[in-house]
Amino acid sequence: METVEMTSVSLKRPHSEDGVANADEIKRQKISEKPKTGNNSGQNIETVTEQPEKSLLEDAKNEIIPNEEGEEQEDEELEESDEDGDPESFADMMKHGLTESDVGITKFVSSHKGFSGILKERYSDFVVHEIAKDGHVSHLDDFSVPVDDEDPSEETFTVLSDEDKKRLEELQLFKNKETSVAIEVIEDSKEKRTIIHQAIKSLFPGLETKTEDRDGKKYIIAYHAAGKKALANPRKHSWPKSRGSYCHFVLYKENKDTMDAINVLSKFLRVKPNIFSYMGTKDKRAITVQEIAVLRITAQRLAHLNKCLMNFKLGNFSYKNHPLKLGELQGNHFTVVLRNITGTDDQIEQAMQSLREIGFINYYGMQRFGTTAVPTYQIGRAILQNNWNEVMDLILKPRPGAEKGYLVKCREEWAKTKDPAAALKKLPVKRCVEGQLLRGLSKYGMKNIISAFGIIPRNNRLMYIHSYQSYVWNNMVSKRIEDYGLKAIPGDLILKGGTAVHIEEDDVDNYTIHDVVMPLPGFDVIYPKHKIGEAYKEMLVADNLDINNMRHKIRDYSLSGAYRKIIIRPQNVNWEVVAYDDPKIPLFSTDLDKLEGKPLPVLPTDGKFRALKMEFSLPPSTYATMAIREVLKMDTSIKNQTQLNTTWLR
């Protein structure tokens, strides 16, 4: 994912005598200031002000990833009521979570004095627009459908009765024993029969049709062309040769994951999710706009869904000959509102000018490391150490903190019995990492943990070792800035034509800190030629790893390494301070607002509250919360935010 999901919590900062750029000092300060407004629950659009503490902490709880890999959205419905305790108890549980300093995030680049603000008081305060490789920014600004002589007419969608559609859907999905469905043509004409044929093939992929005479009446007979394998296979359906095979469209969504939206579309269209492609997934708790491509589904069918879709819309349709690929984007453009800010105009000006001119440290954000007392990087380290008993224990053992009730029971059963089958019975949903590992242990036995672990999807397994690489990188970058500041020095690394080279003494004046990269550890990278290079080695030795041998006996877990810029300077940085009285009102118009002609509420010139509206563009794999952290000078971890907020509200 290019961006990091952040909970809707007040980012108050402790009082500080100066702008010392070190988060460790900020951490030690005592918080006494109380916020002026409450926050809304993660599931509501409206801001809740009557019960700010409960709302604030429930919102943070809704954003918790319940286990190392994060579960699929539908699993949230299984959360048990025993977790709905008072906010104080949830805050106490979150004391066991991670803070930024736990994962090496300790430095700032600017010396300005930080200030308070509330991020995502409304999910509409965080808007992401995808930027394609050619620089085009995705916007939803057109609901029209491309004109195509071979597109089905509007009558295609109304010619079938609800009863006919139900029978056809059951036939399509093999839900009954019928091998065909007969639909009588009431007003018989060739044109009417053509429309019915077209409607069935368009709305129910995998079905074929023919016309039959029965007792002097005309019937359209729908049947399966080639058994179950033909179900929803768009490659088997007729498609005009002159039209591109992929319909590209803009997906505008509110408070919904990208995959959730695609799964909803798949169900409506009766197709498999894998015929959709995209360049990246976007946050849930935000408004996001991105391009999607789908194989052999007409724009008209997609546009027709806008009548029934909740929290997302489709538009800007076009036909092309290619799908989309993950990572094929230039980045994302963010529009962020920080509400109830306390900074002076001078503080805000200094912070934003620094962001525009210098940038921020390109740390891997908190979501890279999970939110429980067992960070994902620890599991990654155990994998690299080939310590499979430790891997199993870290994933399955009980841990303090906020988790779903059934996971707690599963872990307790595992700790008590070490019986994978018994522990698995405690999980109503088996697709989480814990469930997959337990299934693997049941199948392969406790003496073959490697094979059992291999049942977990590859991307999830690799997430752990990538988390460890990120952990090392964050720590080394903090040490690099601590020891050498924000200037390029001899021995630093830069990229020339994609190849890393060291900066030499006689060449150092040709480079700035914005050119410097640092390696993620691996067998195919080089390290700085100053004491930070030695620090990498020392850190890995302390973790029982050999920096000169990052190949693993299991090929998937061999780390080739990579390079990452240590400072990112956002593009298209703009900001303004907006006064407002009502925390529930929007402070800018979204794409959908503009399409629907909704005017912005009239804002006061001198309101009770002030908000900072900021815009900036970032490259892929860069964390927007790290840019916001630099502006506010605040720890972005859920643990820190939750503890700070309960302190203010006491």
Where are these regions (language model features)?
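Non-catalytic, substrate/partner-engaging modules appended to enzymatic cores
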Residues: 2-650
